[in-house]
């Protein structure tokens, strides 16, 4: 199996090298044909996904994972529309970032270029395959995909349709490869000679496993423990819809809020209101001791502050001020997305400056942490690392850059020693 996978990786790398040289028009043409093929085969895709869903239900799949697995017509159509959004995005390849004369006839350029081959490992979410493949092709990268076993039929059908569509384009079908067995993950993680970036999308434990078992750079986040802090100066009529949306609009999402922090001065008034709104949406509430004194809720433990529920569960804590809220978030948060609700601009700015997260919001739902909503067309994942790329990662995170230096016989010795010729260092 290892030898076969190495052969596939070599083929993908060769296809990626050619893909990286194609024009924007050629890459966009390939994407348009992929979108057309997916649209023409919607019934086939939905049927394959339905078979996956039925098998998953027989196996007792968790509700949060089932929600990710389910690919209905609307979700599929949204993914196809996302391909057209990617087509309309600027070309990330060949972008001139620096153009500088070092000396006469010695010119330096920094130019963006594809990474090479992406290894994408994801659980459930078959539409992620569509999003990632479109971004990979647009950015000139090959991609090796490994979906979860629960989505095997969906991913197989999607990949077959995409590869068939690419046969009529300048992009080789071998630029997109699908792995189908769990055993292949370990081998994939060892292919640092052929794979340039690993992007895992899945549970906390799964992402940590990937991070700990490869020498290939990893882009991703291990969990999404997101917070909202309701300040003493919050407009409660604005606050309730924000909190309800952040928790219930899609609770399985990594940008759904998991902990609600409330300023102690407004807690007696606000808690009953938000509790009524959330329980009407079947949300289970867990609270600290101060919360329990105001209303009956399940006790929150220390473990709750670190938990990504991915479900209709919300932990609540009452805090004395914004600094306490920031301290809690920076201690227990996952550096994903955290927000403040307040009409006090100075307090909001303190929060925006001091919370150590990829996304820090003011007066809006955490659910906006998404590449599509940011106008990236789609995203390959969300990175919570401090170094870039950070937050929702779209095309800009799938390219690197190289330096082109064009001279006319210059040598380094001319520019060193007591009679060194000075550089001009003039931006062009």
UniProtKB/Swiss-Prot annotation:
Record-stated family: Belongs to the gamma-glutamyl phosphate reductase family.
Protein name: Gamma-glutamyl phosphate reductase
GO biological process: L-proline biosynthetic process
GO MF terms held by the record: glutamate-5-semialdehyde dehydrogenase activity; NADP binding
Enzyme Commission number, as recorded: 1.2.1.41
Annotated localization: Cytoplasm
Catalytic activity: L-glutamate 5-semialdehyde + phosphate + NADP(+) = L-glutamyl 5-phosphate + NADPH + H(+)
InterPro entries from the UniProt entry: Ald_DH/histidinol_DH, Ald_DH_C, Ald_DH_N, Aldehyde_DH_dom, G-glutamylP_reductase_CS, Glu-5-SA_DH, GPR_dom
Provenance organism: Picosynechococcus sp. (strain ATCC 27264 / PCC 7002 / PR-6)
Main location, first listed in the record: cytoplasm
Function noted in UniProt: Catalyzes the NADPH-dependent reduction of L-glutamate 5-phosphate into L-glutamate 5-semialdehyde and phosphate. The product spontaneously undergoes cyclization to form 1-pyrroline-5-carboxylate.
Record key words, sorted: Amino-acid biosynthesis, Cytoplasm, NADP, Oxidoreductase, Proline biosynthesis
Top-level enzyme category: oxidoreductase
Source taxon at top rank: Bacteria
Biochemical pathway: Amino-acid biosynthesis; L-proline biosynthesis; L-glutamate 5-semialdehyde from L-glutamate: step 2/2
């Amino acid at each position: 199996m290892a030898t076969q996978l190495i052969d596939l990786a070599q083929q993908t790398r060769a296809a990626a090298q050619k893909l990286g040289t194609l024009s924007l028009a050629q890459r966009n043409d390939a994407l348009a044909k992929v979108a057309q093929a997916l649209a023409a085969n919607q019934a086939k895709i939905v049927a394959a996904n339905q078979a996956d869903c039925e098998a998953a239900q027989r196996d007792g799949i968790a509700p949060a994972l089932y929600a990710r697995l389910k690919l209905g017509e609307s979700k599929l159509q949204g993914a196809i529309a996302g391909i057209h959004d990617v087509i309309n995005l600027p070309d990330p390849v060949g972008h001139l970032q620096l153009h500088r004369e070092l000396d006469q006839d010695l010119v330096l350029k920094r130019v963006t270029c594809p990474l090479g081959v992406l290894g994408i490992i994801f659980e459930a979410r078959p539409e992620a395959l569509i999003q990632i493949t479109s971004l990979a092709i647009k950015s000139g990268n090959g991609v090796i995909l490994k979906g979860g076993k629960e989505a095997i039929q969906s991913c197989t059908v999607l990949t077959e349709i995409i590869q068939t569509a690419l046969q009529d384009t300048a992009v080789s079908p071998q630029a997109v490869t699908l792995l189908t067995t769990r055993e292949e993950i370990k081998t994939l993680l060892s292919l640092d000679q052929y794979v340039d970036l690993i992007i895992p999308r899945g549970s906390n434990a799964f992402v940590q496993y990937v991070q700990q078992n490869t020498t290939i750079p990893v882009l991703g986040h291990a969990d999404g423990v997101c917070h909202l802090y309701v300040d003493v100066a919050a407009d409660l009529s604005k606050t309730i819809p924000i909190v309800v949306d952040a928790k219930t609009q899609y609770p399985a999402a990594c940008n759904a809020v998991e902990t609600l922090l409330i300023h102690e001065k407004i807690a007696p008034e606000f808690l009953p209101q938000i509790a009524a709104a959330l329980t009407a949406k079947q949300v289970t509430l867990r609270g600290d001791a101060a919360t329990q004194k105001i209303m009956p809720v399940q006790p929150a433990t220390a473990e709750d502050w670190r938990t990504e529920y991915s479900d209709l569960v919300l932990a609540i804590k009452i805090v004395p001020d914004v600094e306490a809220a920031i301290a809690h978030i920076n201690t227990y948060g996952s550096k994903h997305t955290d927000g403040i609700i307040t009409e006090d601009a100075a307090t909001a700015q303190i929060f925006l400056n001091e919370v150590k997260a990829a996304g820090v919001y003011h007066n809006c739902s955490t659910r906006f942490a998404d590449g599509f909503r940011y106008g990236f067309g789609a995203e390959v994942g969300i990175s919570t690392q401090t170094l870039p790329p950070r937050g929702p990662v779209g095309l800009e995170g799938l390219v690197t850059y190289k330096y082109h230096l064009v001279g006319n016989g210059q040598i380094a010795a001319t520019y060193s020693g007591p009679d060194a010729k000075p550089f001009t260092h003039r931006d062009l």
